[in-house]
């Protein structure tokens, strides 16, 4: 008996957005139908929205192309943001000093799964 795949995943690594800011947006789509999730992301005025929308669309495309899943029955099963490598920079300050600036990056993961009707 072959196990049937009912979920697909997409990951964007080392995206130049702070994980804390991306998590605010990713919390909005977790558990939603994919059509509703795309609509939410399209009208959310946050810098993370287009990035997460792109990852979600990639997961949907993976589900359709790789596993022949029905797009109309897909739900965002998992959506999370992990911290990527931090780029460390310095900003010159007064009197010869310098302040550290941490440019944080994120790893964004979205898993969509097919919900069986009935």
UniProtKB/Swiss-Prot annotation:
CDD domains: Ribosomal_L22 (cd00336). It holds the Pfam family Ribosomal_L22. It comes from the Bacteria. One of its GO terms (biological process) is translation. One of its GO terms (cellular component) is cytosolic large ribosomal subunit. Keywords: Ribonucleoprotein, Ribosomal protein, RNA-binding, rRNA-binding. This protein binds specifically to 23S rRNA; its binding is stimulated by other ribosomal proteins, e.g. L4, L17, and L20. It is important during the early stages of 50S assembly. It makes multiple contacts with different domains of the 23S rRNA in the assembled 50S subunit and ribosome. The globular domain of the protein is located near the polypeptide exit tunnel on the outside of the subunit, while an extended beta-hairpin is found that lines the wall of the exit tunnel in the center of the 70S ribosome. NCBIfam families: rplV_bact. Belongs to the universal ribosomal protein uL22 family. Part of the 50S ribosomal subunit. HAMAP family: Ribosomal_uL22_B (MF_01331_B). This is Large ribosomal subunit protein uL22. It comes from Listeria monocytogenes serovar 1/2a (strain ATCC BAA-679 / EGD-e).
């Amino acid at each position: 008996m072959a196990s049937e795949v009912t979920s697909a995943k997409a990951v964007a690594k080392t995206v130049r957005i702070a994980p804390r800011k991306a998590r605010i947006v990713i919390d909005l789509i977790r558990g939603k139908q994919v059509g509703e999730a795309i609509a939410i992301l399209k009208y959310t005025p946050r810098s993370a929205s287009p990035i997460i929308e792109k990852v979600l669309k990639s997961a949907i495309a993976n589900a359709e192309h790789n596993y022949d899943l029905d797009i109309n029955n897909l739900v965002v099963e998992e959506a999370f943001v992990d911290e990527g490598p931090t780029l460390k920079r310095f900003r010159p300050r007064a009197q010869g000093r310098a302040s550290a600036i941490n440019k944080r990056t994120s790893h964004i993961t979205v898993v969509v799964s097919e919900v069986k009707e009935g």
